[in-house]
Amino acid sequence: MNKKSTAIFLMGPTASGKTDLAIQLHQELPVEVISVDSALIYKGMDIGTAKPNAQELALTPHRLIDIKDPSENYSAAEFRRDALREMQKITQQGKIPLLVGGTMLYYKALLEGLSPLPSADEKVRLEIEQKAEKFGWATLHNELAKIDPISAQRINPNDSQRINRALEVFYLTGQSLTELTAQKGEEIPYHIIHFAIAPERAVLHQRIEQRFHKMIEQGFQQEVEKLYQRSDLHPNLPSIRCVGYRQMWEYLQGNYGKDEMIFRGICATRQLAKRQLTWLRGWKSPIEWLDSLNPKSAKEKIIKTIKHNCK
């Protein structure tokens, strides 16, 4: 039986220091970085996604960054396909894939494979959105509760994106999202070592607030204004629904003032971090937890573990 090649998952909430740690690891280990981030895939969305800058990318190239235009969709299935392709290239070079990011659904899809969910259908989605405009998303959430009570319990009544997808799956297949996701996909053909970096809640909240203000100073508004001027972009696209971008877009629409936009952006980012941590706490595979306040200790722990596993 062939021994599986090793790959590293470096997971964690937004603003936890994953990118800095990955850059340090790239200097000391034979690793190549693959981004696991549903926002970093978009070209022209750099400041609001805290994308590594040109200097950092020159030092440590990240694969699966800047691969899509903001007008395009990108599914977990596409990520899995692309990530496995890049992982194979890296292992063929005699190096270790280091997967870094906070999009936990991507990690799950990569690790466990995907159940046979149908592709998005614009016609069905539009019909659902029109129904929501007429009756409200709360009514559609009630409809979902009758079709798929487990998904309805998990999905917030205000989460229009996920309600839409759950109903879309049922309309297209006649089966609930819960039924379909119970069908296992193909597991990843790698030995994965799972690391997670997660600051204390107060520290994380402070970092998120500081980073959002820094993004504003760096020209985040101007970045979104360029997107806002494009006729092919609208608030229902996954790119514009990204945390921070949605709030800035609504500010540019005149929905509220700048202070309110900043407040909402920070709150939305904190909520994202909370969801990411919930995923991590429920992670099925054993996780090596890293000290976010001591990057040197975190780096040394990973190096020691990798060297031990790759003997």
Swiss-Prot record:
It catalyses: adenosine(37) in tRNA + dimethylallyl diphosphate = N(6)-dimethylallyladenosine(37) in tRNA + diphosphate. Keywords: ATP-binding, Magnesium, Nucleotide-binding, Transferase, tRNA processing. Its cofactor is Mg(2+). The keyword Transferase applies. SUPFAM superfamilies: P-loop containing nucleoside triphosphate hydrolases. The keyword rRNA processing does not apply. It comes from the Bacteria. Catalyzes the transfer of a dimethylallyl group onto the adenine at position 37 in tRNAs that read codons beginning with uridine, leading to the formation of N6-(dimethylallyl)adenosine (i(6)A). Belongs to the IPP transferase family. This is tRNA dimethylallyltransferase. It comes from Histophilus somni (strain 2336). The lineage of its organism: Bacteria, Pseudomonadati, Pseudomonadota, Gammaproteobacteria, Pasteurellales. The gene is miaA.
